[in-house]
Swiss-Prot record:
Gene3D superfamilies: HAD superfamily/HAD-like, Putative phosphatase, domain 2. Pfam families: HAD_2. The gene is ppaX. Its EC number is 3.6.1.1. This is Putative pyrophosphatase PpaX.
Length: 220
């Protein structure tokens, strides 16, 4: 089936916010709970909505921790955020080929926009679906379905690219083929367990997948 739309997760997929997220959690937990945590205690929850992760640390204090986390995260956002290799070049190619694009993230819209604008990526995306845009979030299908609705694209002609099991599960439950990135900070076996339709080792391989899907359609 020809691919006419590609949906992308944001953090860890097209921009690298791993250090920002880890530092934000370390600071927040130490401030409110009085002990230090390591990256290994945070990384397994990458990809899920922030309130849920904070509730894993404290059912009582998660709301005040949420404010602290967001304040720290916004303050140091630009310092600890980097763009993933070849992202801009591949997005430009997708644009040239007339393929619609969307960001589908569990992050708040304004902070997601900030990350895109920081690297001048916003011009490559037709749609942004953030935390506020759906009641249910990944791994539920709602964010993916919302993006497809806004793009006016059929699920059969879409791909969802992400770095976590939540991206794969959200895509599958929405009836969309999934692409897992091998540069995820999460263990490869964790992604493999969810059986994504494709794996890519770099962004350029995404174009090969799209081309392969187009060729399959022509052979039918």
């Amino acid at each position: 089936m020809k691919i006419t739309a590609v949906l992308f997760d944001l953090d860890g997929t097209i921009i690298d916010t791993n250090q920002l997220i880890i530092k934000s959690f370390v600071y927040t937990v130490e401030k409110h709970l009085g002990y230090k945590i390591g990256a290994e205690e945070v990384i397994p929850y990458f990809g899920e909505p922030l309130p849920l992760t904070l509730q894993r640390f404290s059912k009582d204090k998660w709301e005040i921790m949420l404010k602290t986390y967001r304040d720290y995260n916004e303050k140091y956002h630009d310092r600890y955020t980097k763009i993933r290799e070849d992202v801009k070049e591949v997005l430009a190619r997708l644009k040239e080929e007339g393929i619609k694009t969307a960001v589908v993230t569990s992050k708040r819209r304004e902070l997601a926009k900030r990350g895109l604008k920081l690297f001048e990526l916003d011009k490559y995306f037709d749609v942004l679906v953030g935390l506020e845009d759906t009641e249910k979030h990944k791994p539920e299908p709602d964010p993916v379905l919302k993006a497809l609705e806004l793009l006016k694209s059929p699920r059969e002609e879409a791909l969802m690219v992400g770095d976590s099991p939540y991206d794969i599960l959200s895509a599958r439950s929405a009836g969309v083929r999934s692409v897992a990135v091998k540069w995820s900070v999460l263990p490869f076996e964790l992604l493999k367990k969810e059986k994504p339709d494709y794996f890519i080792e770099d962004m350029w391989q995404l174009l090969k997948i799209i081309k392969g899907c187009d060729e399959d359609e022509h052979e039918q």
